[in-house]
Amino acid sequence: MNVLVINAGSSSLKYQLLNPATGALLAKGLCERIGIDGKFTYKPQLEGKEAIKAADVAMPTHNEAIAAVLNALVDEKNGVIGSMKEIDAVGHRVVHGGEKFAKSVVITDEVMAAIEECNPLAPLHNPANIIGIKACQQLMPGVPMVAVFDTAFHQTMPPVAYTYAIPYEYYENDKVRRYGFHGTSHKYVASRAADMLGKPIESLKLISCHLGNGSSVTAVDGGKSVETSMGFTPLAGLPMGTRAGDIDAGILEYLMNKYGYSIGEMLNILNKKSGVLALSDGVSSDFRDLEEGAEKGNERCALAREKFAYEVKKLIGAYAAVMGGVDAIIFTAGVGENDALERMRIASGLEYMGVKMDEDANNVRGEERVISATDSKVKVLLIPTNEELMIAMDTASLVG
């Protein structure tokens, strides 16, 4: 079975063609600058097939982008499948499912209407996701489509975790609550952790640290999300590449009054000009640049790295308390998978809860392995995330 995985943005579209049963990747690529001057990238994973890198392809809409993807996949010379009939289903990443979706679903007219009702909760993402779905429906009639939601995994959180301490009417009338994000990633690595530990996921207490330009930590108890650091939006929680994370709301009023910022300007600062970029005094939002700066004696770069590790460590301690213990801590995503120094910073000081790192095992990038010492009571795991494979697996389970 082959599943085409689509992640549609407002002017871009990422795609992968996978076999969810074996995990085999047949092809992947990217459509960029849709609606502007289209750039198309195609990377077949079969031997002897030639890639296409940032080629000029007219893509006035997402329909042309999807058409370019399909044409490349079935191309007589460099395609990876013989015909469109070999695409059994399409899995779509959808950012926000609100409270309507606690799991992935086959897309119907009713599902599309419900996704559109969630647009106000993710105005930058959901409308683009919907455009991608509609383009595929037009070009691939009869092929089953599945929506996989970033928020769905966290719908198992109890009210004590998701309810904000503001007038309850805002939850009842406006659905203001903690939703959490990166759910597909947290779900995937939690499943892999159970496999690595050789234990049923129902018996495990896991803390998943998805650390990248966007970062979140999730407590997974018995395979279910019970707490997570992102909130109503992906702006909450940890300081990230350019996002502030948790901040005293009174600061916003203070700065808006003092400098005359509009709400839009204030949100732009919090989303685009904060996080480790701000902590490093504008040096970079990239942790590699921050480490280089810190090594050269830049105290602000050092502060940015230390602050990030400090906040992750706080969440690990808090989530262990929420679950009454922890069996394993997982590091994943760009920073989590590739930054051995930051992993050590985070783990340092967690010895009291039974964490004991193996420095040699930790000195690796992007390789699935145990990075704690053999006698560590709490295991520490490095697990590269694979959201596309998780989407393909969910899709196959629903339509297979």
Predicted feature locations:
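Short beta-strand-loop/turn "lid" adjacent to the catalytic site in phosphate-handling enzymes
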Residues: L73-H125, A152-A161
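A mobile "lid/hinge" subdomain adjacent to the ATP/sugar-phosphate binding pocket shared
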Residues: Y259-A304
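Internal helix-turn-beta structural module
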Residues: A302, E306-V322, V326-D327, G336-G400
